[in-house]
């Protein structure tokens, strides 16, 4: 057999050596000599410290100090990883691990005991602690309350807007500090300087789907390609059951189902 054919040959049980006993034909997890140290291979279990198997196949209890290289960052003991830790988390047990919610060492954010506090949320590259809350005063700033250390979805200060210098402005009410989906001021439009303009009524401050003047034909430059009238788009056309002629707007839009101009296939009345 050539070297190329040998490389391409699929791996079978006959070509597999057990790392526990060194014999071919089975894996370590199926080894009939599981209690033996086998041929003393270099594989060492970091749970019990014995050679011949890996931690996921370990038949023994975890032992402190078994594998010096592996250290649990929850309790600080060697011999297991955090996901297998049988002990309670000890603050500061693992130096270098820092929770981004409270800023303390020794646990990750998912294990944070202060998860209900106002310090939740992300942080920027420049990290600094902001007082008793333990939150980071990095680049992230909440656009609801203006405080640093959390983002809007984690804001503990409700829906109220703020008068900070942020560039977020709601196009529904014109107030800074929140976006339209979080607006506490209802559907009312505003006469701000925003560039958002409803093409139904021609007023700024809202989009067509939120327009309080649904019956208005407006002065927008958008035209429905179904009926040719301005003020709405095809999916909102009140004349959906009408005939579709090429002279009723729609330009070069042609349905590939019926061949008529003025609509596309998903809106075809002849389907």
UniProtKB/Swiss-Prot annotation:
<keyword id="KW-0479">Metal-binding</keyword>
<comment type="function">
    <text>Binds to single-stranded DNA located in the 5' hexanucleotide repeat region of the L.major leishmanolysin (GP63) gene.</text>
</comment>
<keyword id="KW-0238">DNA-binding</keyword>
<feature type="region of interest" description="Disordered">
    <location>
        <begin position="107"/>
        <end position="136"/>
    </location>
</feature>
<keyword id="KW-0677">Repeat</keyword>
<feature type="zinc finger region" description="CCHC-type 6">
    <location>
        <begin position="168"/>
        <end position="185"/>
    </location>
</feature>
<feature type="zinc finger region" description="CCHC-type 8">
    <location>
        <begin position="222"/>
        <end position="239"/>
    </location>
</feature>
<feature type="region of interest" description="Disordered">
    <location>
        <begin position="1"/>
        <end position="42"/>
    </location>
</feature>
<feature type="zinc finger region" description="CCHC-type 5">
    <location>
        <begin position="140"/>
        <end position="157"/>
    </location>
</feature>
<dbReference type="InterPro" id="IPR001878">
    <property type="entry name" value="Znf_CCHC"/>
</dbReference>
<feature type="zinc finger region" description="CCHC-type 2">
    <location>
        <begin position="43"/>
        <end position="60"/>
    </location>
</feature>
<feature type="zinc finger region" description="CCHC-type 3">
    <location>
        <begin position="70"/>
        <end position="87"/>
    </location>
</feature>
<protein>
    <recommendedName>
        <fullName>DNA-binding protein HEXBP</fullName>
    </recommendedName>
</protein>
<dbReference type="InterPro" id="IPR051714">
    <property type="entry name" value="CCHC-ZF_NABP"/>
</dbReference>
<feature type="compositionally biased region" description="Basic and acidic residues">
    <location>
        <begin position="21"/>
        <end position="42"/>
    </location>
</feature>
<feature type="zinc finger region" description="CCHC-type 4">
    <location>
        <begin position="97"/>
        <end position="114"/>
    </location>
</feature>
<dbReference type="GO" id="GO:0008270">
    <property type="term" value="F:zinc ion binding"/>
</dbReference>
<feature type="zinc finger region" description="CCHC-type 7">
    <location>
        <begin position="196"/>
        <end position="213"/>
    </location>
</feature>
<feature type="zinc finger region" description="CCHC-type 1">
    <location>
        <begin position="16"/>
        <end position="33"/>
    </location>
</feature>
<feature type="compositionally biased region" description="Gly residues">
    <location>
        <begin position="118"/>
        <end position="136"/>
    </location>
</feature>
<feature type="zinc finger region" description="CCHC-type 9">
    <location>
        <begin position="253"/>
        <end position="270"/>
    </location>
</feature>
<dbReference type="GO" id="GO:0003677">
    <property type="term" value="F:DNA binding"/>
</dbReference>
<dbReference type="GO" id="GO:0005634">
    <property type="term" value="C:nucleus"/>
</dbReference>
<dbReference type="InterPro" id="IPR036875">
    <property type="entry name" value="Znf_CCHC_sf"/>
</dbReference>
<keyword id="KW-0862">Zinc</keyword>
<keyword id="KW-0863">Zinc-finger</keyword>
<dbReference type="Pfam" id="PF00098">
    <property type="entry name" value="zf-CCHC"/>
</dbReference>
<feature type="compositionally biased region" description="Basic and acidic residues">
    <location>
        <begin position="1"/>
        <end position="12"/>
    </location>
</feature>
<keyword id="KW-0539">Nucleus</keyword>
């Amino acid at each position: 057999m050539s070297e190329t054919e040998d490389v391409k040959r699929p791996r079978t049980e006959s070509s597999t050596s057990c790392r526990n006993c060194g014999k071919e034909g089975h894996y370590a997890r199926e080894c009939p000599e599981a209690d033996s140290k086998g041929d003393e291979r270099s594989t060492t279990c970091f749970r019990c410290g014995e050679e011949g198997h890996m931690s996921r196949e370990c038949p023994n209890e975890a032992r402190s100090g078994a594998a010096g290289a592996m250290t649990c960052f929850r309790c600080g003991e060697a011999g297991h990883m955090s996901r297998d830790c049988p002990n309670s988390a000890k603050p500061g047990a693992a130096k270098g691990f820092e929770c981004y919610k409270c800023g303390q060492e020794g646990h990750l954010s998912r294990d944070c005991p202060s998860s209900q506090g106002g310090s939740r949320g992300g942080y920027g590259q420049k990290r600094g602690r902001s007082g008793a809350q333990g939150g980071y005063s990095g680049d992230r700033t909440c656009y609801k309350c203006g405080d640093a250390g959390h983002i809007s979805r984690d804001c503990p200060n409700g829906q109220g807007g703020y008068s900070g210098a942020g560039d977020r402005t709601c196009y529904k009410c014109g107030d800074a500090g929140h976006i339209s989906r979080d607006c506490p001021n209802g559907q009312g439009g505003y006469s701000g300087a925003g560039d958002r303009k409803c093409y139904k009524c021609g007023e700024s401050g809202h989009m067509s789907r939120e327009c309080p003047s649904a019956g208005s034909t407006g002065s927008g430059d958008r035209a429905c390609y179904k009926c040719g009238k301005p003020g709405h788009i095809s999916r909102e056309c009140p004349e959906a059951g009408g005939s579709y002629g090429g002279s009723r707007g729609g330009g070069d839009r042609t349905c590939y189902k019926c061949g008529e101009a003025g609509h596309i296939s998903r809106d075809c009345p002849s389907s």
